[in-house]
Curated annotation (Swiss-Prot):
Record's compositionally biased regions (Low complexity): 1-42, 126-155, 170-194, 221-236, 278-290, 368-388, 444-455, 473-503, 518-533, 560-580, 595-605, 658-673, 690-720, 766-782
Keywords: Calcium, Collagen, Extracellular matrix, Hydroxylation, Repeat, Secreted
InterPro entries assigned to the protein according to its UniProt record, in alphabetical order: Collagen, Collagen_superfamily
Subunit structure, as described in the record: Trimers of one alpha 2(I) and two alpha 1(I) chains. Interacts (via C-terminus) with TMEM131 (via PapD-L domain); the interaction is direct and is involved in assembly and TRAPPIII ER-to-Golgi transport complex-dependent secretion of collagen.
Region annotated Disordered, chain positions: 1-887
Gene that encodes it: COL1A2
Protein name: Collagen alpha-2(I) chain
Compartment list: Secreted; Secreted, Extracellular space; Secreted, Extracellular space, Extracellular matrix
Length: 887
């Protein structure tokens, strides 16, 4: 019929989810190039939006499972979003629609539910400890950055040979106790693994687009022209304003487990004895003095120079993993920020399709089934008589007893390839279902490979040129706006006329049966193309059971009749007994490749397979960037008291005065970290996300080739009588009885007609009761390999399997060749003097000193040298008056 009048243009809809990967259609005839319209004027900048308030930080979630790389579909043309209708039956994935105009930015959503905790990796071997670097100055604690992706564990390093015994350095004066270091988590030793892929950072908030220019007068839509030549690529637009700043800082993670105390260091050697002192003469015993007061703690001495490294000790016993810390309290849920103003509609730009992605790996070959016993060849059936054009529905017979399993017959010779069937009339469109609830945000998937290049669409008529506007200043980054309302659905187009059916092929001669050897089980074929939905017939009343008739020979294929009206679903019969296995038919030649099918629905995830054999270790990746310093940990335990030094020469007994408090000895060397503990219990899987919005159903696919005729099944039991359906609409006039068999035509196939618009969908019938389970059909010949299917969504993780049997303990490895002694590093710069440490505990009381003996009287020393004459002193004060003289 003629094309209907185009309705008014609805408001722009929200951006839909990317559709599945489309298949490349046949190239259209080149049309005349369209006229290039002048560029529109750039509108003035929009008002800046208000930034929303930041919500409270949520509870940190566990690391989610690594998503599977999904196939990236070709970027289709934007479709016009329709009004959500009732939920219809799930249709086939259709061709990508026209891309709609981008909607206004949405409001910032709540943080998603925490993802499921990943399964811990395999236990790595302990790598050789690296050389100790010079102690750097304590820097200020930086802000906690976002956690980067966890890199894969690197290959285990070989244990290094013990180094040469270092020289014993002089015992330095004890330095001041430094501040307690940050409490670190127990790290997994090993060689650094390759750098993981860069994390997908969250996209910045899109800037507010400028206000649209004054629209020109609306032109009358012209007829759709033929596909024009590919136009030149447009000029790249100016980059948008920068995104908003990063989100608020996350809650710091729980503190790591307390580190193990290092082993005590070796006792240093005794110092050389001093020169003997001059024995003094015994002095007189003095009066015992009063008890002195506690001495004042002296200023800590400067830190001694670092001595050479000592001999490496034996590795310590493997540490035990401490119990898991308690889960922190749930954070206060964040408050949704105020929605910003609705931004204007962006420009309608159609991107170019991406390059074709790589082909996925083939799946594992299934196990071969048990070969069945060889069956006797069955007799050939008689050809059935020509039946009427359309027979009435027979009465349903009772269910027969289960048959015995037949013996497979010999393989016959391959028959001639049949002519390709005629193309069926496409079915009518289904009513789009209502939009489902909004799903929770799932874990981010990895970037998919680029899909194949799609065909170039028809070029639309160019619009009138708008007035040139002044160039506006760049706008301020606005807050995300709310999504605009969905636009009204377009008027469905009229149904196109059916194509002219091609000539019918001649019937091939039956093949000669020969006894052949049983072939090996074939590989699992790819799924064939999906057939179109057949027409529904009206439900007839259930009749009494009739006897099973003899098997007739397959009749000739009739011409495709016109599509009848949509019927209502009839009642389904009760479940029948499983039928006997039929004879294996002869394998025919491969037919022509079928039409490209649409991707099937995603299958359910199977149970986890057995662990594969570990591959060889890959080459070490480049060194990662220096990580951000973590928060300062809790103060460690007080170190052990130093070992008692070697006894010096006996001194003279002193007075019994209490000495000052001793300084805590320096902590011992840190022991070698133990081996990694056993694998922890996997975390609880996160909640399943809500289903995403239902996409627009695509047009039905082309009808697939007819399948192989199966053995007739056992008659099922009569089902319950269905309800009377509504009377169907009048169908098109019939074509009469089948004519005589004509000679094959010699004309060339006509040009392919244009695809007609989608017809209206009929009313959906009420669902009938469950159908009868039919007998197992015979295995047909293997069809041609279908196109590469689109990889389905990753299923949810399965339940945890039972714990495996402990493996056999491996043999002790051969000791490696001692490595070459490394160069002695330069002496590190002395570290800065740390603050005074806490006062140590009181040391044990020393032994009670004995009373000293009286010393010898000292010898008379030599006469001293007379000193030089000093300067004259100041004049003294005047003396008192003298006595009076004699008169």
């Amino acid at each position: 019929g003629p094309m209907g009048i185009m309705g008014p243009r609805g408001p722009p809809g929200a951006s839909g989810a990317p559709g599945p990967q489309g298949f490349q259609g046949p190239p259209g005839e080149p049309g005349e190039p369209g006229q290039t319209g002048p560029a529109g004027a750039r509108g003035p900048p929009g008002p800046p939006g208000k930034a929303g308030e930041d919500g409270h930080p949520g509870k940190p979630g566990r690391s989610g499972e690594r998503g599977v790389v999904g196939p990236q579909g070709a970027r289709g043309f934007p479709g016009t979003p329709g009004i959500p209708g009732f939920k219809g039956i799930r249709g086939h994935n259709g061709i990508d629609g026209i891309k709609g105009q981008p909607g206004a930015p949405g409001v910032k959503g709540e943080p998603g539910a925490p993802g499921a905790r990943g399964i811990p990796g395999e236990r790595g071997r302990v790598g050789a400890p690296g050389p100790a670097g010079a102690r750097g100055s304590d820097g200020s604690v930086g802000p906690v950055g976002p956690a980067g992706p966890i890199g894969s564990a690197g290959p285990p390093g070989f244990p290094g040979a013990p180094g040469p015994k270092g020289e014993i350095g002089p015992v330095g004066s004890p330095g001041a106790s430094g501040p307690a270091g940050p409490r670190g988590e127990v790290g997994i030793p090993g060689v650094s693994g390759p750098v993981g892929p860069p994390g997908n950072g969250a996209a910045g908030i899109p800037g507010v687009a400028g206000a649209p220019g004054i629209p020109g007068p609306r032109g009358i839509p012209g007829p759709v022209g033929a596909a024009g030549a590919t136009g030149a690529r447009g000029i790249v637009g100016e980059p948008g304003p920068a995104g908003s700043k990063a989100g608020p800082q996350g809650i710091p993670g729980p503190s790591g487990e307390e580190g193990k105390r290092g082993s005590t260091g070796e006792i240093g050697p005794a110092g050389p004895p001093g020169p003997p002192g001059i024995r003094g003469s015994p002095g007189s015993r003095g009066i015992p003095g009063a008890d002195g007061r506690a001495g004042v703690m002296g200023i800590p001495g400067s830190r001694g120079a670092t001595g050479p490294a000592g001999v490496r000790g034996f590795p310590g016993s493997p540490g035990n993993i401490g119990p898991a810390g308690k889960e922190g309290p749930v954070g206060i849920p964040g408050i949704d920020g105020r929605p910003g103003p609705t931004g204007p509609a962006g420009a309608r730009n159609i991107g170019f399709p991406g390059p074709k992605g790589p082909t996925g790996d083939n799946g594992d070959k299934g196990h071969a089934g048990i070969a069945g016993a060889r069956g006797a060849p069955g007799p050939d059936g008689n050809n059935g008589a020509q039946g009427p054009p359309q027979g009435g529905k027979g009465e349903q017979g009772p269910a027969g007893p289960p048959g015995f399993q037949g013996i497979p017959g010999p393989a016959g010779t391959a028959g001639e390839a049949g002519k390709p069937g005629e193309r069926g009339i496409p079915g009518e469109f289904g009513i789009p279902g209502p939009a489902g609830p909004r799903g929770e945000r799932g874990p981010p998937g990895e970037s998919g490979a680029a899909g194949p290049t799609g065909p170039i669409g028809n070029r639309g008529p160019s619009g009138p040129a708008g007035p040139d506007g002044n160039k506006g200043e760049p706008g301020v980054v606005g807050a995300p706006g709310t999504a605009g309302p969905s636009g009204p659905s377009g008027i469905p187009g009229e149904r196109g006329a059916a194509g002219i059916p091609g000539p019918k092929g001649e019937k091939g001669e039956p093949g000669i049966r020969r006894d052949g050897a049983r072939g090996a089980p074939g590989a699992v074929g790819a799924p064939g193309p999906a057939g179109a939905n057949g027409d529904r017939g009206e439900a007839g009343p259930a009749g009494p059971a009739g006897p099973a008739g003899p098997r007739g020979s397959p009749g000739e294929r009739g011409e495709v009749g016109p599509a009848g009206p949509n019927g209502f679903a009839g009642p389904a019969g009760a479940a029948g007994q499983p039928g006997a296995k039929g004879e294996r038919g002869t394998r025919g030649d491969g037919g022509p490749p079928g039409a490209t099918g649409f991707p099937g629905a995603a299958g359910r995830t199977g149970p986890p397979g057995p662990s594969g054999i570990s591959g060889p270790p890959g080459p070490p990746g480049p060194a990662g960037k220096e990580g951000i310093r973590g928060p300062r940990g809790d103060q460690g335990p007080v170190g052990r008291s130093g070992e008692t030094g070697a006894s010096g020469p006996p001194g003279f007994a002193g007075e019994k005065t209490p000495g000052p408090q001793g300084i805590i000895g320096a902590p011992g060397f840190i022991g070698i970290p133990g081996s990694r503990g056993e694998r922890g219990i996997p975390g609880v899987a996160g909640s399943v996300g809500e289903p995403g919005p239902i996409g627009i159903a695509g047009p039905p696919g082309a009808r697939g080739p007819p399948g192989a005729v199966g053995n007739p099944g056992v008659n099922g039991a009569p089902g319950e009588a269905g309800r009377d359906g509504n009377p169907g609409s009048d169908g098109p006039p019939g074509r009469g009885h089948k004519g005589e068999r004509g000679y094959p035509g010699a004309g060339a196939p006509g040009p392919q007609g244009p695809v007609g618009p989608t017809g209206k969908h009929g009313n959906r019938g009420e669902p009938g009761p469950a159908g009868v389970v039919g007998p197992t059909g015979a295995v047909g010949p293997r069809g041609p390999s279908g196109p590469q299917g689109i990889r389905g969504d990753k299923g949810e993780p399965g339940d945890k399997g039972p714990r495996g049997i402990p493996g056999i303990k491996g043999h002790n490895g051969i000791q490696g060749i001692p490595g070459i002694a490394g160069h002695h590093g330069d002496q590190g710069a002395p570290g800065s003097v740390g603050p005074a440490g806490p006062r140590g505990p009181a040391g044990p009381s020393g032994p009670v000193g004995k009373d000293g003996r009286t010393g010898h009287p000292g010898a008379v020393g030599p006469a001293g040298i007379r000193g030089s004459q000093g300067p004259a002193g100041p004049p003294g004060p005047p003396g008192p008056p003298g006595p009076p003289g004699p008169s």
